[in-house]
Each structure stands twice: as C-alpha cells, then as structure tokens.
Amino acid sequence: SDVCSSDLFRLFKKTWPGIVQLAEDLGVKIGIENCPMLFTNDEWPGGKNLATTPAIWDRMFDMIPSKALGLNYDPSHLVWQMMDPIKPIYDYKDRLVHIHLKDVKVYKDKLDRNGILATPLAYHSPKLPGLGDVNWNNFFTAITDIRYRGPLCIEVEDKAFEGSDADIRSAILTSRNYINQFLPY
C-alpha cells in the first residue's frame, strides 16, 4: 500500500500537533531526520521512520503547517533510495533545521545481486563526506544558494573509521579537511 495513506499518518496526526505546539510556544524548531531507519528484515519494508521522502514531507507539512516542524536533512538517505539529494534542498529550504554531512557508497555489484528490495545495508555503506556518491560540490552550491546558515554536523558512520579513538579523530579531521573546500565562511 501507499505509505502516504498508512496508519503511520493517523498516528502522526494524533501525536505530533501537541509536540509541535509546545515547540512553537518555546520558540524551538523540531527537525525530523529523513532516515528510513531500515536496517534489518524485521523493519522491512518501510523502516521505522515516517519522514523519508518528499511526498511524505509534503503530507506531514500539510497536516501540521507550523514552521516549528522541519527536517534534519541527510543527503545520504536519498542517495541510497536512488533519489536526487539536491533538489529537496531548494524545495524545502524553509524546513531545513539541521543538516547531516554524511556520504554513502552504493555498490552497484551488490545492488545488482541483491536488488533494491533488499535491506539497504546489503548494497550500500555509510561513508565520510567525499568517499561516497554524494556530489558535495552540488550540495554546497545548493545550501549556499538558499543561504542556509543552520547547523552542519559531520555524522561519522563509516566502518573504516571505527575501532579506536585515533580512528574517530581521523574520521573527523578527514571530513573537516574535505568539507572546508566548500565552506564560504
């Protein structure tokens, strides 16, 4: 069935208006990450998060039009879903609350073997910025075009940089050094 007409929207409509109203009252913005939270077979087919695609975001924002509700945007999640990760930056510029700087590598040979309906980790791997398939030049052009001045957070989930404090420091420095070429400030 169409995820846009699922029981999740009834639950969203029941649960979120009060939370968003409280955020408005406190002058706080809520950013829901666009990660499907789909990692294992028990989460298939839809994952554990509603806010995963532009069609769903439109429905959410129609249901709760408050500007206190927005997105914690991570381009990598659209890449592995075979979607354009740049266009939503322009389309949802007024809803971007927080941005994750995380890349992803889609392994075509694994995708060809497992298919798009496999759990996503069967064919992709989270990567540091610059080590995957996100076009960071286009990404930073877009966030510069829309004059985004909110938080940018390096999200390290690259398995090649796990195991020790030195690996973690290396991941952060490698990411920072790559990203610095795009920052206008």
List the model feature ranges, each with a label.
Residues 1, 36-38:
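Mobile beta-alpha loop/short-helix "lid" or hinge segments that flank ligand
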Residues 4, 17-21, 25, 29, ...:
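Histidine-acidic metal/acid-base catalytic patches
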Residues 30-36:
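Short, structured patches in soluble enzyme cores that scaffold and shape functional sites
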Residues 1, 6-8:
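Flexible, glycine-rich active-site loops centered on histidine and acidic residues
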